[in-house]
């Protein structure tokens, strides 16, 4: 619609009044929720713009065309304003002289108008539902497109020919995946137990080999000890023989010396008489010499005896040292065996404690799961009972309210009928007094009362039907909720059954994978060259490992 001159004038007057009232403006609130686009673009204070724009529901181009069509852009239009004291000629401006007016488009005005509308709760819920449905539809479309693109990508990846580098990368990725799966499977309790069994078999094999090696070394040491004892005994016998030979030679020398002395004495016996003194002297010298020889012999015998004692002491010391070394070696071996036995006992005790702890944790988990399931089933049964009890209570409340209202209506009806009867009696008395005059009036009154009664009865019937419909809808809603709860419970049980079946299948597959890995480990153990008896013992222990229970 074209903009009228009166509209422009009224807008200018309103702007002038607002400018005059600016000084009397008081702040009502610190913050405001008014659309800022109503105030136009933010301008600097230097431009002299006020904060009271005039809103014209036309854009600049439409306004310019309108003014051009009216001819206002060529010749200014004047308006004569007559007041009580003067007459003025006012020029209608073609532009906003103050520069404070805001010109917005109809679309912007409609947007501001729509934004200022306060939505009700139903409208907000409807808008939220529409937004939620739109979002779900968008997400479904996105997921569908993603699935289609993923399928196309899988088909393209399966059909395309890989390059050498991609083949190497693919093979490396598969190897890494297999290694990761293998490492993940190694963390299973059965495989850990299998690794412990294999390690235990290796330890037993190493320990038996060490024991055999110790026995061999001990046997060699005993043989060497016997050989050294024999050598020392032979050396001792030789030393004794040499000592006896030396004693024999010395005795022979003494005997030969004595014989020579006797021969010399016999030879010089003839000269004794002549050389008595000389002989006596010689005899004395000879006796001294004999004594000296005897002393030397005694000293020599004592020295040889001391050497013999020293040699025996040395031999005893060597024997004692050998016995001491033997005792120390036996003590070390015994200590090593005790340490090995203590380590084995402690290890077995730790393993027993660990297995007992694992068994206790498993039993506690089973008890907790059973308790949670019992609580869940009890809560579901309790919720269903509460829903049924709540529905029954609501139904009883509704029935009591209906009976109360029925009694109230019956009481009112009886009161009304009593009043009617009383009124009728009065009317009959009045009719008897002035029957001719009041016949038509009584008939009209009777018809009015009868019509009111019928309307009241119809109204009560409609209200009763409405209440019955409401009760029926409420009962149907309760039954629907009970059915939904029962269906949810059935679905939960089906889901629980499916979950148990899936867990059982996964446990079976896991059991097969673990058995395959056990067989491979036993084959690798045999491939290491371990004796067959240890392999058989490890296989026997691996076959009696307990399987993981699935709840």
Curated annotation (Swiss-Prot):
Expressed in respiratory cells and in sperm (at protein level). Expressed in nasopharyngeal epithelium and trachea. It comes from the Eukaryota. Microtubule inner protein component of sperm flagellar doublet microtubules. Interacts with AK8; dimerization with AK8 may create a cavity at the interface of the dimer that can accommodate AMP. Interacts with CFAP52. Interacts with ENKUR. Directly interacts with DNALI1. Interacts with DNAH11. Interacts with DNAI1. The keyword Coiled coil applies. Residues 1-30, 461-489 are annotated as: Disordered. Microtubule inner protein (MIP) part of the dynein-decorated doublet microtubules (DMTs) in cilia axoneme, which is required for motile cilia beating. It is an AMP-binding protein that may facilitate dynein ATPase-dependent ciliary and flagellar beating via adenine nucleotide homeostasis. May function as a donor of AMP to AK8 and hence promote ADP production. GO terms for cellular component: 9+0 motile cilium; 9+2 motile cilium; axonemal B tubule inner sheath; axonemal microtubule; axoneme; cilium; extracellular region; nucleus. Residues 157-526 form a coiled coil. GO terms for molecular function: AMP binding. Keywords: Cell projection, Ciliopathy, Cilium, Coiled coil, Cytoplasm, Cytoskeleton, Disease variant, Flagellum, Heterotaxy. InterPro entries: CFAP45, TPH_dom. One of its GO terms (biological process) is cerebrospinal fluid circulation. It is linked to Heterotaxy, visceral, 11, autosomal, with male infertility: A form of visceral heterotaxy, a complex disorder due to disruption of the normal left-right asymmetry of the thoracoabdominal organs. Visceral heterotaxy or situs ambiguus results in randomization of the placement of visceral organs, including the heart, lungs, liver, spleen, and stomach. The organs are oriented randomly with respect to the left-right axis and with respect to one another. It can be associated with a variety of congenital defects including cardiac malformations. This is Cilia- and flagella-associated protein 45. It comes from Homo sapiens (Human). The keyword rRNA-binding does not apply. It is found in: Cytoplasm, Cytoskeleton, Cilium axoneme; Cytoplasm, Cytoskeleton, Flagellum axoneme; Cell projection, Cilium; Cell projection, Cilium, Flagellum. Belongs to the CFAP45 family.
């Amino acid at each position: 619609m074209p903009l009228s001159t009166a509209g422009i004038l009224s807008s200018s007057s309103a702007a002038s009044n607002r400018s005059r009232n600016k000084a009397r403006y008081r702040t009502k609130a610190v913050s405001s929720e008014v659309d800022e686009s109503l105030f136009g673009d933010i301008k600097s204070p230097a431009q002299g713009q006020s904060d009271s724009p005039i809103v014209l529901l036309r854009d600049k181009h439409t306004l310019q065309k309108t003014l051009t069509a009216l001819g206002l852009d060529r010749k200014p239009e004047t308006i004569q304003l007559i007041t009580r004291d003067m007459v003025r000629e006012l020029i209608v401006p073609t532009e906003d002289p103050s520069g404070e007016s805001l010109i917005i488009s109809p679309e912007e005005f409609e947007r501001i108008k729509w934004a200022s509308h306060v939505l009700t709760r139903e409208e907000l819920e409807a808008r939220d539902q529409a937004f939620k449905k739109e979002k779900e539809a968008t997400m479904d479309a996105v997921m569908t497109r993603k699935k289609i693109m993923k399928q196309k990508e899988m088909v393209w990846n399966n059909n395309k020919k890989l390059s050498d580098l991609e083949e190497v990368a693919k093979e490396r990725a598969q190897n890494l995946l297999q290694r990761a799966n293998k490492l993940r499977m190694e963390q299973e309790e059965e495989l850990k137990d299998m690794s412990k069994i294999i390690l235990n078999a290796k330890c037993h094999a190493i320990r038996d080999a060490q024991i055999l090696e110790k026995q061999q070394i001990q046997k060699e040491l005993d043989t060497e000890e016997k050989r050294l004892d024999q050598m020392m005994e032979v050396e001792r016998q030789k030393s004794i023989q040499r000592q006896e030979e030396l004693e024999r030679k010395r005795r022979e020398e003494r005997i030969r010396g004595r014989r020579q002395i006797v021969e010399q004495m016999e030879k010089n016996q003839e000269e004794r008489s002549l050389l008595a003194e000389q002989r006596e002297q010689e005899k004395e010298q000879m006796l001294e010499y004999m004594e000296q020889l005897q002393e030397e012999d005694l000293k020599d015998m004592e020295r040889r005896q001391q050497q013999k004692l020293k040699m025996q002491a040395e031999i005893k010391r060597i024997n004692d040292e050998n016995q001491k070394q033997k005792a120390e070696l036996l003590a070390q071996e015994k200590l090593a065996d005790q340490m090995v036995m203590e380590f084995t006992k402690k290890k077995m005790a730790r393993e027993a404690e660990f297995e007992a702890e694992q068994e206790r944790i498993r039993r506690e988990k089973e008890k907790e799961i059973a308790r949670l399931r019992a609580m869940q089933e009890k809560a579901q049964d309790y919720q269903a009972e509460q829903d049924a009890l709540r529905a029954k209570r609501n139904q009883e409340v509704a029935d009591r309210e209906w009976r109360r209202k029925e009694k109230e209506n019956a009481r009112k009806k009886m009161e009304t009928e009593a009043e009617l009867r009383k009124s009728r009696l009065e009317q009959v008395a009045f009719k008897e007094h002035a029957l001719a005059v009041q016949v038509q009036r009584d008939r009209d009154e009777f018809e009015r009362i009868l019509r009111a009664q019928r309307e009241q009865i119809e109204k009560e019937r409609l209200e009763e039907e409405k209440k019955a419909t409401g009760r029926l809808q409420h009962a149907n809603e309760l039954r629907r909720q009970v059915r939904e709860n029962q269906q949810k419970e059935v679905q939960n049980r089906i889901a629980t059954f499916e979950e148990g079946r899936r867990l059982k299948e996964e446990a079976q597959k896991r059991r097969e994978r673990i058995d395959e890995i056990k067989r491979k480990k036993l084959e690798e153990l045999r491939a290491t060259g371990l004796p067959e008896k240890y392999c058989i013992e490890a296989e026997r222990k691996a076959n009696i490992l307990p399987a993981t229970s699935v709840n």
